[in-house]
Regions:
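Acidic, glycine-rich segments characteristic of secretory precursors and extracytoplasmic regions
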Residues: 1-15
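Structured, solvent-exposed acidic/aromatic patches
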Residues: 16-198
Length: 198
């Protein structure tokens, strides 16, 4: 449904809310609990599930749980926090932020933060994950990421590519585009992936 909403593809049916999200002129999103197309609900719930698991891992590391490789677990925790909060910020106007220390209360409704604040937080977590991976020369197993994508070099490049992608993807207006930190985007991109996946 998000592809049709972005005019990337089309569909002859209204499956998964495609018609509702992609009709033009745009119509208001049906945000009631009775709405049958759960395209945003499933996305929302899945990303908060990843965030909860990532926070639990981070909490365990911070409180001395015995792991074979606590640095690797901490890096995975920070990466999970970054990607879940970052991708929530790409889609929603408000994000409820939390990490291993608990809720990070924003000024919005029921403690929500704006998408800009959420992305700033997510990129901070991503930068922490990159720093841990680089300083500890961490990698992930072939089982976790097949095809060599879990090597330290590939992992660091992947995280940098995600930073560039999230930073640019979060721009929602011409004004935001004009004031974006393009130097940071370039720094991420230059340290990112240069090869394609097969």
């Amino acid at each position: 449904a998000m592809q049709t909403m972005a005019d990337i593809s089309s569909c002859s049916w209204g499956n998964f809310g495609m018609r509702d999200l992609s009709s033009e002129p745009r119509v208001a999103l049906n945000n009631t609990s009775a709405y049958g197309n759960n395209v945003t609900k499933s996305y929302f719930n899945a990303l908060y599930s990843v965030l909860t698991d990532s926070n639990t891992l981070g909490f365990a590391v911070a409180n001395g749980t015995d792991f074979d490789n606590p640095d690797q677990i901490e890096m995975v925790s920070k990466l999970g926090q970054a990607l879940s909060i970052g991708y929530l910020a790409l889609v929603f106007d408000k994000v409820w932020i939390s990490d291993e220390t608990g809720a990070v209360v924003g000024a919005g409704l029921e403690g929500a933060s704006s998408y800009k604040e959420a992305m700033t937080f997510a990129l901070g977590k991503l930068d922490q994950a990159i720093a841990i991976a680089k300083s500890k020369n961490l990698s992930l197993s072939e089982t976790a990421i097949p095809g060599g994508g879990g090597s330290n070099a590939s992992l660091v490049q992947f995280m940098n590519s995600m930073g560039a992608r999230m930073l640019v993807g979060n721009l929602r207006s011409s004004e935001e585009k004009a004031s974006a930190d393009w130097a940071k985007v370039l720094t991420y991109a230059n340290a990112g992936l240069t090869n394609d996946f097969e």
